[in-house]
Each structure stands twice: as structure tokens, then as C-alpha cells.
């Protein structure tokens, strides 16, 4: 056992003997002092607990430091977690600035269940393209009603504050990923005090949260922090995750906020630290060339090997091929029309017509930004590729509402499905622990596509989040679950509870047991639909 593992084990043992007060379960003893949660009827909550020093001042653009302060009074863990400062796609109006820079907290939700003295733990990383989103946006009422596990929501730095990088040791980037990792360490060390089982931690996330889960898992010591991982509609190989071109964008950020005289990374970092955080985040709008496109102008990067506290120094593909990653059970998923999240905004009505009309004149300009190959090809190669994929999916059709479904399929394939297949293929060849996958096809009455398109008269199919928002309530649904969705919701929640506590990595959904892909010649894919589930084998994803 290495030093980090020993410290975690000793911390868990010590904290296990200092759990919540049996006379008052709202009071919990931590190394920092006592905190008080809230009784919500069917569950307890302990919100906005700091796990890191505030990433402000000199700590901006630095790896997070563990929270060191001691509480002389009882810490009131009753405040809804604040969103990390962001330029939020879903905030209406011109000013989309939301949140605060001091935001590195975890929030814990514990069911009341007299039959259990302890619970498995599901740690949750929210999505939002590494640019926006918040822990509070993913509701927990469905999960708490089932009463199967403790839920921990992680907040982490976003946008330029979390992911600006010059690609060298002065401003290496990936601060948001480093936040997540520190939060996981905090959970491992402290969750026993809340009645959680530190040996039964499952890490999950959706979209950028799912990609974050996969990236965390690519750390070789991940198994010391969690026993399993689940990536919903997002993984490390998606083209919008680990991007190139970050150095140019970091200096462009500097020019946008008055740091144009900075000629090297060190001086740029110093200047950016001196600027108001709101100014840095508001500058995100300068990187958007069409609505909220590209949806992830700042994202994870490859860091140089000499960077302090480096998180990711190799392409994820090479990490998986090396076998030197967290060899724990992993599941990944996609829905049949994930790309609706990216394409639906093109059906929004404007005074000059629907937005998709613009693509007829601007496809060669916009496609590299929609599909994230703007920094990987020459101008000629980008144009050739843009023409080819249009021909492959739309043929001679023009861009309009009649051809929209083909465009949405293009977005689904390139941004989600193809990379899900590639990641699963690598894990089945180089992984040692089980690797599972499912595809979901059961459209919601209202979801993220209807919100972005601002219309309900189009059948978008099963879009990004239609499965995940049955586990965690989200503002984009705005409708009650149908009876079939209530069954699916319970199946998903039970699936997570069982995965977190399983000793052999077995994964089940309802009556269907997932099949392991490791060592399999064909892809083992569980299809989940309105009235059941079925195991299917594929040479390529359907």
C-alpha cells in the first residue's frame, strides 16, 4: 500500500469512530469541527461543506489545496450549494453570468432508513460541457425516496477558471479535474462520519460529468478512491473533451481582458490572476461564434509531464492501451439521439427564419466548431472533411427542418456514439475489470432539445439526458414522469445502489444482467426501452 492509500485508510478508521451523534443525527464531527445538517423529512442533508481552500487570489489557476480551517462554532451545513462562476448556456437574456468563484464544496444526502446503520455511497459529478452546470441542478428527491444509498454532489471549477491552459508548467490547466479528485479524497476520508461505507463508493456523472468520471478512472490509483465508475453519455474519448488549441485560447482570453502585453505564460497567469473573476468568465462570450457554439471552448487538456500536480499527461487512448489506469468495473452509456443537445438550437425560430438556414451558407465555417475539429486539421482538410460528412449524412439535401433528423444523427455519431464505441473497444481489449454498456431509447415528453429549440412541435427522439433526468430531477423536464418512466427511474436507482455495493462488479438493470465486454469479440450492449430491456451483441454500435 502506498503512502496516499495508508493515509486514507487511517483517516477512515479514525472518522469511523467519530460518526454522527446518536442523540442528534444532524450533528457530525469532522477534523475541522462539528457541523449541523438539516432534517428534510425522509432524509438528512449536509450541504456546502468545503473540501478545498477557496480558489481565489493567489490560489486562482492553481491546483486545489485541502481545506485547512478549523470551526470554533458549529458549521451550519444547511445552505444550497452555490454554482461555480460560469457563463451559463441556460440562463436567459444577454447576461449569462452565474455563480461565485469560492465554490469548492461537497453536499451530502442521507436517507432515513431504520433498517440500515450504513449505506453505500454514490459520488456525483455534474455535467455542463465543463463550462456551466451546478450540483444543485441535479435533484435528489427520487434517489432519497428509494433510500438505497448516500448521495454526494461535487462542485468544481468551470470554464476558464477551471480549464484555461497554456500547455506548459506555468498554466497547465485541468484545475476542475484536480478539484474533483480532491473532493473524492475528501469523501473517502470523511464519508464514514455520515454513515457512508468508504469501501463502497461509486463515482458517476452525465455528459461532461461522465467524461470526468472516465478521466478520473484513468488515474492508476483510482481504485483507492472508488470501487466502480459509471459514465452516462460522456467519456474521455469524446472529441469535445480533451482538446487541442488551448494555448491560443488562453492568450486570446488574456487579450480580451486587457492582458495583451503578456508575452509568456508566467506573465499571462499573473495578469489573469489580477483581473476580476467575473471579467474572465464574461469573456467566454467572445469565444462563441453561433449561439453557444462551440459549447466547450475551455476543457481538459494534456499537461506536460513536468507540470506540478499534473493530472493528465498522455492521450486517454494511450493510457487505456498501457493498462495503467484504475482497473475497476466501469459502465458507459449513450442514448439514441444524444446529439439533439447540440443540434436542437438550430430549430429555434428567429425573425429571419429558423437558425438551421444559416448552415447552407456557413457550413464550412461552423462545422469545425460544432464538431470540434477546428484545432486538429488544416483549413483545406477541415473543408474537405466538412463536405464529406455532409454528403455522407445529408446527400444533396439542403439544411432545413426536413433534413434536420439526419443532421442530428450526424451530431450524435460524431460527438457521442462513435467515441463511446471506441472507448468500450479499448477497454474490452486492455481492461481487466468488467466493462459494461447500455443504449437508451425512450423519448421524454419534454427534455433538453425542446428547451434549446423553444418548440414542442418536433419529435426529437430520445435526447441527451432523457435517461439521466429520471434519476436526478432537472429543470429541463418540467413534466411529471409517466408510469413507464417511474419504473425505469426505480430500475436505474436500484442499479446504482447494487453497483456501489457489489463485491464482484456485477451490474443489473431490472431483470437484465449486463454482459461484460472485456475479452468479448462482439460488443455486449444492453438495450433499455419503454417496456423492458434486452442484451444484444453487435459488431458495431447500432
From Swiss-Prot:
Annotated function: Transferred from the ejaculatory bulbs of males to the female genitals upon copulation, plays an important role in the reproductive biology.
Protein name: Esterase 6
Membrane-crossing residue ranges in chain numbering: none
Result for mutant: residue 56 to T: In strain: 197
Entries under InterPro entries matching the protein: AB_hydrolase_fold, CarbesteraseB, Carboxylesterase_B_AS, Carboxylesterase_B_CS
Gene Ontology MF term list: carboxylesterase activity
EC number, UniProt record: 3.1.1.1
Subunit description: Monomer.
Biological source species: Drosophila mauritiana (Fruit fly)
Signal is among the record's keywords: yes
Glycosylation sites: 40, 418, 454
Active site: 207 (acyl-ester intermediate), 464 (charge relay system)
rRNA-binding listed as a keyword: no
Localization, UniProt: Secreted
Annotated S-S bridges: 84-103, 259-271, 512-533
Upper lineage: Eukaryota, Metazoa, Ecdysozoa, Arthropoda, Hexapoda
A Pfam match: COesterase
Entry similarity comment: Belongs to the type-B carboxylesterase/lipase family.
Amino acid at each position: 500500500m502506498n503512502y496516499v492509500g495508508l493515509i486514507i485508510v487511517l483517516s477512515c478508521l479514525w472518522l469511523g469512530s467519530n460518526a454522527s451523534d446518536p442523540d442528534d443525527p444532524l450533528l457530525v464531527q469532522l477534523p475541522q469541527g462539528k457541523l449541523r445538517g438539516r432534517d428534510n423529512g425522509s432524509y438528512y442533508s449536509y450541504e456546502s461543506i468545503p473540501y478545498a481552500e477557496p480558489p481565489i487570489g493567489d490560489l486562482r489557476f492553481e491546483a486545489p489545496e485541502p481545506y485547512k480551517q478549523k470551526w470554533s462554532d458549529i458549521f451550519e451545513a444547511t445552505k444550497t450549494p452555490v454554482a461555480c462562476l460560469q457563463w451559463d448556456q441556460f440562463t436567459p437574456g444577454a447576461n449569462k453570468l452565474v455563480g461565485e468563484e469560492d465554490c469548492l464544496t461537497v453536499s451530502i444526502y442521507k436517507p432515513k432508513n431504520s433498517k440500515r446503520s450504513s449505506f453505500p455511497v454514490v459520488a456525483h459529478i455534474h455535467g455542463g460541457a465543463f463550462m456551466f452546470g451546478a450540483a444543485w441542478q441535479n435533484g435528489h428527491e427520487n434517489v432519497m425516496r428509494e433510500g438505497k444509498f448516500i448521495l454526494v454532489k461535487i462542485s468544481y471549477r468551470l470554464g476558464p477558471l477551471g480549464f484555461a491552459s497554456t500547455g506548459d508548467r506555468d498554466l497547465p490547466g485541468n484545475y476542475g479535474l484536480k478539484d474533483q479528485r480532491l473532493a473524492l479524497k475528501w469523501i473517502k476520508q470523511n464519508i464514514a462520519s455520515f454513515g457512508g461505507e468508504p469501501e463502497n463508493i461509486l463515482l458517476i456523472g452525465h455528459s461532461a460529468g461522465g467524461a470526468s468520471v472516465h478521466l478520473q478512472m484513468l488515474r492508476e490509483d483510482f481504485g483507492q478512491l472508488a470501487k466502480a465508475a459509471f459514465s452516462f453519455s460522456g467519456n474521455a474519448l469524446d472529441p469535445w473533451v480533451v482538446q487541442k488549441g488551448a494555448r491560443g485560447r488562453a492568450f486570446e482570453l488574456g487579450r480580451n481582458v486587457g492582458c495583451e502585453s503578456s508575452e509568456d505564460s508566467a506573465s499571462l497567469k499573473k495578469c489573469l490572476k489580477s483581473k476580476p473573476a467575473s471579467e474572465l468568465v464574461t469573456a467566454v462570450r467572445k469565444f462563441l461564434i453561433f449561439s453557444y457554439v462551440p459549447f466547450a471552448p475551455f476543457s481538459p487538456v494534456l499537461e506536460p509531464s513536468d507540470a506540478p500536480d499534473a493530472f493528465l499527461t498522455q492521450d486517454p487512448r494511450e493510457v487505456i492501451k498501457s493498462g495503467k489506469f484504475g482497473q475497476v468495473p466501469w459502465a458507459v452509456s449513450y442514448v439514441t439521439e444524444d446529439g439533439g443537445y447540440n443540434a436542437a438550437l438550430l430549430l429555434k425560430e428567429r425573425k429571419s427564419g429558423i437558425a438551421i438556414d444559416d448552415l447552407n451558407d456557413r457550413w464550412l465555417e461552423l462545422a469545425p466548431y460544432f464538431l470540434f475539429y477546428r484545432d486538429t486539421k488544416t483549413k483545406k482538410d477541415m473543408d474537405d472533411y466538412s463536405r464529406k460528412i455532409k454528403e455522407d449524412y445529408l446527400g444533396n439535401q439542403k439544411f432545413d427542418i426536413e433534413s434536420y433528423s439526419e443532421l442530428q444523427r450526424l451530431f450524435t455519431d460524431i460527438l457521442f456514439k462513435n467515441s463511446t464505441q471506441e472507448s468500450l473497444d479499448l477497454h474490452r481489449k486492455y481492461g481487466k475489470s468488467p466493462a459494461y454498456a447500455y443504449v437508451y431509447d425512450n423519448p421524454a415528453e419534454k427534455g433538453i432539445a425542446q428547451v434549446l429549440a423553444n418548440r414542442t412541435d418536433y419529435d426529437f427522439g430520445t435526447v441527451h439526458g432523457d435517461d439521466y433526468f429520471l434519476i436526478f430531477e432537472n429543470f429541463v423536464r418540467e413534466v411529471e414522469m409517466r408510469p413507464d418512466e417511474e419504473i425505469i427511474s426505480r430500475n436505474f436507482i436500484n442499479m446504482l445502489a447494487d453497483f456501489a455495493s457489489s463485491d464482484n462488479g456485477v451490474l443489473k438493470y431490472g431483470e437484465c444482467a449486463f454482459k461484460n465486454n472485456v475479452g468479448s469479440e462482439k460488443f455486449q450492449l444492453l438495450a433499455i426501452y419503454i417496456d423492458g430491456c434486452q442484451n444484444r451483441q453487435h459488431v458495431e454500435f447500432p
